[in-house]
Amino acid sequence: MTSPNESRAFNAADDLIGDGSVERAGLHRATSVPGESSEGLQRGHSPEPNDSPPWQRGSARASQSGYRPSDPLTTTRQSNPAPGANVRSNRFISGMTAPALSGQLPKKNNSTQALEPVLMSNEVPFTESYASELPDLSGPVQRTVPCKPSPDRGSSTPRMGRLEITKVRGTGEIRSQISRRSHGPVRASMQIRRIDPWSMLKVSLLLSVALFFVWMIAVAFLYLLLGGMGVWAKLNSNVGDLLNNTGGNSGELVSNSTIFGCAVLVGLVNIVLMTTMAAIAAFVYNLSSDLVGGVEVTLADLD
């Protein structure tokens, strides 16, 4: 039990702080005697429900109902109540900090100890309950391989064996064909479906001009060769003898001008004929390819 002087000191300290109900409730718990019941504490000094803050209403209701959790901290707090009360009264009255009392004051405040929640034996913390449900994404993702169902070993075994043999043979034939094709040259079959007449005309004109020069070179070579052999002189003498016997004018039948003049005339005619014939041939080929198809051509690599 407390003396009247201590109760007056408590009231003066409550007036100085402005929150007397909170500290009064804490001091009332600290100065309680172990043999005194909770009903006696409520009759002697019971705070009003409106004076206490919300976070201490639960502790006040628990003290009124008579429920005391079995916490070892509460027993140690009740064993040494008097020194804490004296230190608090001195601190509130004088306005100075209380001296450090080693071994007398507990490490935690009584008011804060009363507010600490006590976990039941079957209660699991919030983080532990949800940590087990979360998947572990720190390691590599394991991919499950679908298992193939084993075939039934019964009447279907010979059929399955035959199917496997045919599949193996088919794959072997395909591999042999691919290997043969890979070793041999690559071939491609195509059809020439259309030829442009204008392009054909240009190509034929170029080729005919080239052939004209080839023709003229060939004529000059033959003329020189036959002249060296004396063919043209022999021919001219024979022709002159025939004309003299008949009473005609004798002259040279074969000369340079006559030979090269005739060669140029023949070459020009060949150019015109070859160019026109190539253009006409391209036009006819396009018509025939539309009717019966074009010429098939096989393209292949070098052996």
UniProtKB/Swiss-Prot annotation:
Keyword Cell membrane part of the UniProt annotation: yes
UniProt cross-references to Pfam families, sorted A to Z: DUF3566
Subcellular location: Cell membrane
Amino acid composition bias (Polar residues), ranges on this chain: 61-89
Top-level lineage group: Bacteria
Keywords: Cell membrane, Membrane, Transmembrane, Transmembrane helix
First and last residue of the signal peptide: none
Transmembrane portions of the chain: 205-225, 264-284
Membrane topology reported for the UniProt record: Multi-pass membrane protein
InterPro entries per record: DUF3566_TM
Disordered, as annotated region: 1-89, 132-159
Keyword Transmembrane helix attributed: yes
GO cellular component term, pick one: plasma membrane
Family indicated by similarity: To M.tuberculosis Rv0007.
Protein name per Swiss-Prot or TrEMBL: Uncharacterized protein ML0007
Lineage of the organism: Bacteria, Bacillati, Actinomycetota, Actinomycetes, Mycobacteriales
